[in-house]
Amino acid sequence: MEASSEPPLDAKSDVTNQLVDFQWKLGMAVSSDTCRSLKYPYVAVMLKVADHSGQVKTKCFEMTIPQFQNFYRQFKEIAAVIETV
């Protein structure tokens, strides 16, 4: 994933949003208006997040396979830390 200019998340900060739904699909980009044959896989993710008032917002993004693999490794690290708590 690309480097973020945002400060790292502080676990003590007020995180008031709640994950409502997580959907993903594997896609294949096969062509574009500038390239006849791309043929590269990607992962499309859709998150539904509710704020403190209950309003649900949808966030969608795509990741290349290397970006997804990094994302997956980070979640495995989170799971390992949670298991020690």
Swiss-Prot record:
GO terms for cellular component: cytoplasm; nucleus. Residues 18-85 form the COMM domain. Belongs to the COMM domain-containing protein 6 family. This is COMM domain-containing protein 6. The keyword ATP-binding does not apply. One of its GO terms (molecular function) is NF-kappaB binding. InterPro entries: COMM, COMMD4/6/7/8. The keyword Nucleus applies. Ubiquitous. Expressed in brain, heart, skeletal muscle, lung, pancreas, liver, kidney, small intestine and placenta. Scaffold protein in the commander complex that is essential for endosomal recycling of transmembrane cargos; the commander complex is composed of the CCC subcomplex and the retriever subcomplex. May modulate activity of cullin-RING E3 ubiquitin ligase (CRL) complexes. Down-regulates activation of NF-kappa-B. Inhibits TNF-induced NFKB1 activation. It comes from Homo sapiens (Human). Keywords: Acetylation, Cytoplasm, Nucleus, Transcription, Transcription regulation, Ubl conjugation pathway.
